[in-house]
Amino acid sequence: MRRNEPVTGHEREYPAHYHLITTTDLKGKITAANEEFAEVAGYSIDELVGQPHNLIRHPDMPPEAFANLWETIRKGDSWRGMVKNRCKNGDHYWVDAYVTPIMKNGELVEFQSVRCQPRRSQVRRAEKAYAAWNRGSLPRRFLAVAP
């Protein structure tokens, strides 16, 4: 698993109206990103395209959360959850992520993630849950941190 370091501990704020969008191939390589995503993550679109999406993975995120995400979307189901991402400079930002498998002619061809700014109550709940999960004290079935 990729462990992106260093981290600064500084949270990057972004406008509430932003929608951070990426598309990946079936292996998780970024094939498209919008300007808002690139701006918040601190990369240019050219730097992002072709890179594995875990380029922005924050080390505080439990590996099990991403295992659940991949298991869900590979089955053709959508996934939603709170995600703490790492910026290029080590800062972080929280997103309420909705990941959807894209089908063409009945075949899974790519994934798209649309993210928006979560409520602070969602972030607090996710921080507590993920910290407990990283300590090994949260059951695998606990993933619903959205509402």
Which residue stretches match the model-derived regions?
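Alpha-helical transmembrane segments and their helix-membrane boundary motifs
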Residues: F142-P147
